[in-house]
Amino acid sequence: MQDNTILELAYDISQVTREKVGAIEEIMQTTKILALNARIEAARAGTAGAAFGVVAEEIGNVSEEINHIASDFRDAVEGHTSRIEDVGERM
């Protein structure tokens, strides 16, 4: 396999990975909005919605954790993509 082919394959993989991370970030944003809406509805329900409020809070926490993981992953992919491009330019 030629070096250019390997670099193209690595670059393509990084692009697909970047797209998948973007999709994860979109899902995280939707989850965050749903958690906020659930908190609002739990507050409206008063005491009867207290347990639902706890669940909504936990969903929000999970959403934030996903956000941090996706951000770290995106940074790693961007770094690898940049290195792949640098190697390609030097060839």
What are these regions, as identified by a protein language model?
Residues 8-30, 43-86:
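Parallel, heptad-repeat alpha-helical coiled-coil signal-transduction segments
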Residues 1-8:
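Short, low-complexity N-terminal regulatory "tails/caps" that precede and couple sensory modules
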Residues 88-91:
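Alpha-helical coiled-coil heptad-repeat segments
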Residues 33:
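N-terminal glycine-rich anion-binding loops that anchor highly charged ligand groups
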